[in-house]
């Protein structure tokens, strides 16, 4: 289990990233820090590509009890969130 996520979920995220020309995905939040619980959501910062298609692929096609919070880093993002991602984030796709 890499990045505190099941390997199957990482493979699905990677496949959707490739399909949608995503440049980079950063895991952030409690799962990146390692202080998550089994009910913690999965926070993903997404750079480049077709964000909308990627977002819907994640929401509709990953068969897991995990919930996902997916942030488009190409849109307006608060400085506070950017700093959190830079501080705690782990690149899971590039």
Positions of PLM-derived features:
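Catalytic core of pol beta-like nucleotidyltransferases
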Residues: 1-24, 32-38, 47-94
